[in-house]
Amino acid sequence: MIYFGRSIDNHYTTMMTKTLEIDLRSAEGLKLNRRPIKKKTFAVVKIDEKCRKSNLDESRRSNPTWNYKSEMPINGNEQFIFIEVFYRTGSGHDKKIGEAKIPTNDFMGRYSPEGHLNFLSYRLRDEFGDKCGIVNLSILVKSDPTRDYGACSSQAAVTGLWRPRLETASIDGYGGRTVTGVPVWGLYQRQF
């Protein structure tokens, strides 16, 4: 397939897959028809065709807490993930309160490095586009330990001579403490 003069194949898109650790923390000010919700609520994360459902908050408040962690794969071509919040009726049916549309470049962009924990809050909107609350979550883009070692010998990786380092280095002379160095070469330079 040709797209803007470049060929895109399946191998390219599978290399862009990352793993997200999503923590659905809570919601604030949930409203239905401009009235605070006093029902059991839960949230759903949707990425492409995949979805994960949080536990049900039994408190029956308009500020529910879920603290639900989940890991989900995301293709590098995805532009948005969706968070939907539902309430459960007395008869056991689930009704949608609202949804938040989260751009992936908010946590996978060039200013947000891999391995950085992002705490995010987004406005929930109902089916008419009206504000119906805020959802709070955290997203961590898991880093691939083998990604940075692409420049090392591919032969070493194939033969099993290379393994990613799992422990942190310890320095015997400093008792494991962090040492900070400040360059001072500019202070003592001679003027010629």
Swiss-Prot record:
BP GO annotations: cellular homeostasis; defense response; negative regulation of defense response; response to cold; response to heat; response to salicylic acid; response to temperature stimulus; response to wounding
GO CC field: membrane
Membrane topology of the entry: Peripheral membrane protein
Pfam family, one: C2
Superkingdom, taxonomy of origin: Eukaryota
Tissue specificity as recorded in UniProt: Expressed in roots, leaves, stems and flowers.
Effect of gene knockout: Dwarf, twisted leaves and enhanced disease resistance to bacterial and oomycete pathogens in cv. Columbia when grown under constant loght at 22 degrees Celsius. No visible phenotype when grown at 28 degrees Celsius. Accelerated hypersensitive response (HR). Bap1 and bap2 double mutant is seedling lethal.
GO function terms (MF aspect): phospholipid binding
Subunit architecture: Interacts with BON1 (via VWA domain), BON2 and BON3.
Note: Overexpression of BAP1 can suppress a defect in BON1 and confers more susceptibility to virulent pathogens.
PANTHER family according to UniProt: BON1-ASSOCIATED PROTEIN 1, INGRESSION PROTEIN FIC1
Protein name per its UniProtKB record: BON1-associated protein 1
Organism: Arabidopsis thaliana (Mouse-ear cress)
